[in-house]
Amino acid sequence: MSYAYLFKYIIIGDTGVGKSCLLLQFTDKRFQPVHDLTIGVEFGARMINIDGKQIKLQIWDTAGQESFRSITRSYYRGAAGALLVYDITRRETFNHLASWLEDARQHANPNMTIMLIGNKCDLTHRRAVTTEEGEQFAKEHGLIFLETSARTAHNVEEAFINTAKEIYKKIQDGVFDVSNESYGIKVGYGAGNAGPQAAKPGEGDARKSSSCC
């Protein structure tokens, strides 16, 4: 299937917040309770429809460990959107958001759309970060905000699609020069396969088990 535009995304945040599970839920509509820890960068894709146009989302799922931050930083360049994820049950993942955001804004294009995601909202009995705190952080830093659950699929579609809608609006408003692919946007005619795929050799093949919601 052909597409009008291709948008490149990057998913960032601490390890274990559910980045890979969000991607899997969005591309395959399934939840994997125990997910291998991402080493390096992995890849997924899916077609969506915005304003009657087919949009292909090409999504890079990054490792959250500090030792892989240099690899992650190289993927900020050429991304139109970023999903910045924390775990509502682990306060430290929220506390680290400022560092992730600083990285994103230092290495990405200044018009990149950033969606802040408080994941694992199904675990309300273990909540350590309030919804209001997430909303306030997003407001202070000019981000879009949603709470999601990769387990139940709550707001997962909305997180990816609302980010795409914001990017599409910026195209309509002339914010992006779509002929410049360094903005993470490509005007396209053909289409590729949707669904999680392996990253480049050596980037996603070494893994460890980790719980994921």
UniProtKB/Swiss-Prot annotation:
For the ligand (GTP), the binding residues are: 13-21, 61-65, 119-122, 149-151
Q: Fetch the CDD domains from UniProt.
A: Rab2
- What are the lipidation residues for S-geranylgeranyl cysteine? 212-213
Alphabetical GO CC annotations of the entry are:
plasma membrane
Give the matching PROSITE patterns: RAB
Q: Where is the composition biased (Basic and acidic residues)?
A: 202-213
Query: Where found, per UniProt?
Result: Cell membrane
Q: How does it sit in the membrane?
A: Lipid-anchor
Q: Name one GO molecular function term.
A: GTP binding
Which residue stretches belong to region Disordered?
A: 194-213
Instruction: Tell me one GO biological process term.
Output: protein transport
State the family it belongs to.
Answer: Belongs to the small GTPase superfamily. Rab family.
Query: Cross-referenced PANTHER family, in alphabetical order?
Result: DRAB11-RELATED (PTHR47979)
- Briefly state the protein's biological role: Protein transport. Probably involved in vesicular traffic.
Protein name (record): GTP-binding protein yptV4
**Organism per entry:** Volvox carteri (Green alga)
